[in-house]
């Protein structure tokens, strides 16, 4: 198969949702269809000791939430599918947002009883910003939920995206009978031995069933007043195809996967800092690091840089340019994933995600190129932390482990590090409280370094250029610090303190990140 054909086979997407909407369960079912797992281990198995395949870190298994993004790959129906399962917990939005920079489409899982929730809305905004296609799976039809028409209306009103139902539920909860598949023009049956039936058989199968009569009315209404189906509008991110189903009972998931692969895009090009778009079909290899994860295997204190291949082909042992440092690196020890299990890979192409073993060479956002190509891809977004804690080692004899742990976890992007300009004290910044808990848990479990953490509360963070900085600007209402790149930054105690500073120093420019 030619390189072009290989690249065109790739489908790379992320699954996004609010916590508990069933995202990890649907990931399991997709892997099951891809033949990667023999049984779909649902997340509910906390007591039985069967954990979801994609939740691999110790703390995730204890809590039943995904706190890092897993990468999984399988072959299905002539396509090579790369799934990135992102953390649904709102405190992990940083890792999730960066992961969304490495995919060509998103699958949004919505709980039919709860509709669009806060975290889904936040993640959708990042996806919308990139103009990538969004496919919606409305989950948990095996339980009672909200009216399908109401859910579609909410998608359009809350997220501002037009929707088109690919199928429609016949009943819900105990009265759930199956799906009226508009796209494939058939019925998918929840009960009985037969999985499918023709639409013509519907009236006979569901004689006197009030839910089926309602479905026919709803569909008539949608055909008259709903949005038109448009493949181009889907690819442009302006129309979301909506699928109903139940991941827990594995109903409607395969139909979703088949249809998703029919319409999901091939690998996209990516923009460079100069505004050029690198074509995925270009023969020269290029890629960018969107995530760094330490200690994926606690037995080997390792670090892996996750790279999205943007163009060309990776071959084991190839030399690459690291544009940020101007130095070369050799990609000899490279892996692909199935959550915690991984295998060495000899080649991969545009659209694939590879893991490069890292001894401290790489940073999140790094561009890798070959030959004379020395461009850089557009930077990944940085997120401004909202809450802070002072941190120090509990045992001064463990300084070395403490510094190693902090350095690795900060490079991973799990937490942000700041140093007090005057005292040199370490301060950690996070988007949410859970990031601190995971940091503490991992420092103790993976680096054997107990830490003392003192809450500093919420702060308003702004960066300042070295040229504008005068240390006398520091006052009781702000803390002057340096970020991990040694850039000066002010941590203001609140918005009032920020406004007071801006009034006092009107010529000074303060910068805010995303």
From Swiss-Prot:
Q: Which InterPro entries match?
A: EF-G-like_DII, EFG_III/V, G_TR_CS, P-loop_NTPase, PrfC, RF3_C, RF3_dom_3_sf, RF3_GTP-bd
Give a single Pfam family match.
Answer: EF-G_D2
Q: Where in the cell is it found?
A: Cytoplasm
List the PROSITE patterns hit by this protein, alphabetically.
G_TR_1 (PS00301), G_TR_2 (PS51722)
The UniProt keywords, alphabetically, are: Cytoplasm, GTP-binding, Nucleotide-binding, Protein biosynthesis
Gene Ontology cellular-component terms listed: cytosol
Q: In the record, what terms sit under GO molecular function? A: GTP binding; GTPase activity; translation release factor activity, codon nonspecific; translation release factor activity, codon specific
Domain tr-type G, by residue range, is 8-268
Q: What is its main location?
A: cytoplasm
Binding of GTP: at which residues? Answer: 17-24, 85-89, 139-142
**Any single biological process term in GO:** regulation of translational termination
What family does the Swiss-Prot or TrEMBL record give for this protein?
A: Belongs to the TRAFAC class translation factor GTPase superfamily. Classic translation factor GTPase family. PrfC subfamily.
Q: What does this protein do?
A: Increases the formation of ribosomal termination complexes and stimulates activities of RF-1 and RF-2. It binds guanine nucleotides and has strong preference for UGA stop codons. It may interact directly with the ribosome. The stimulation of RF-1 and RF-2 is significantly reduced by GTP and GDP, but not by GMP.
Q: What is the protein's name according to its record?
A: Peptide chain release factor 3
Species this protein is from: Streptococcus pyogenes serotype M5 (strain Manfredo)
Gene transcribed to yield this protein: prfC
